[in-house]
Amino acid sequence: MLAIKTRVKTAKGRKLSSTRWLHRHLNDQYVQKTNKDSYRSRSAYKLIEIDNKFKLLQAGQKIVDLGASPGGWSQVASQKGVKVVAIDIKPVNTISGVKYIQYDINELETLRERFKDQKFDVILSDMAPESCGLKSLDHIRIMLLCEAALNFAKHFLNYGGKFVVKIFQGESDKDFYNELKKMFKIVKYFKPKSSRSESTEMYLVGLGFISNSFPI
């Protein structure tokens, strides 16, 4: 089947860069698949690729989707028959089989009261800051989110559990990788094909959580 491209004209008042972005977005095969497959975001395909590679999700597991809005990753996970808790400071529309909690993940004491002694098999984080257009600053901001996600994992991840977190490549990602190496038996970088080639976005996957006995 021939792909039909959508042409976008530069509207009055619209910057050329915006027109180029819109053209790329409308002709993105994953955006088109998102509409066809009824996923809430194209990032759903990133989790599908990560899961195919690392076999993260298994029926009956309990997982947490951090920064879940708009819900693409939670959709994918719920289709695997896992029990999903989606956490975000933004509201998320109802997804069948997903329990949504509106919290800031930095409010650990509140979350500890909520979850008590509950632990999870997989913790996912596709969190990213709103881009300011300056790569070095965006990198710093996403690494702060990575640290918040890892701190959550220290409290709530089961021994032997799995952890996935989005990073932007930069001067600090290697330090974060080394931090994960102390806590997981296996740590891998992974860039899904559905991640745009020009993006510095990658994922770090930690397999086999060793212990939460270190200071938290």
Curated annotation (Swiss-Prot):
Its EC number is 2.1.1.166. Coiled coil: none annotated. It catalyses: uridine(2552) in 23S rRNA + S-adenosyl-L-methionine = 2'-O-methyluridine(2552) in 23S rRNA + S-adenosyl-L-homocysteine + H(+). Keywords: Cytoplasm, Methyltransferase, rRNA processing, S-adenosyl-L-methionine, Transferase. Specifically methylates the uridine in position 2552 of 23S rRNA at the 2'-O position of the ribose in the fully assembled 50S ribosomal subunit. Gene3D superfamilies: Vaccinia Virus protein VP39 (3.40.50.150). It is found in: Cytoplasm. It comes from the Bacteria. This is Ribosomal RNA large subunit methyltransferase E. Its main location: cytoplasm. InterPro entries: RNA_methyltr_RlmE (IPR050082), RNA_MeTrfase_FtsJ_dom (IPR002877), rRNA-MeTfrase_E (IPR015507), SAM-dependent_MTases_sf (IPR029063). S-adenosyl-L-methionine binds at G71, W73, D88, D104, D126. It is an enzyme of class 2 (transferase). The keyword rRNA processing applies. One of its GO terms (cellular component) is cytoplasm. Belongs to the class I-like SAM-binding methyltransferase superfamily. RNA methyltransferase RlmE family. Pfam families: FtsJ (PF01728). One of its GO terms (molecular function) is rRNA (uridine-2'-O-)-methyltransferase activity. The active site is at K166.
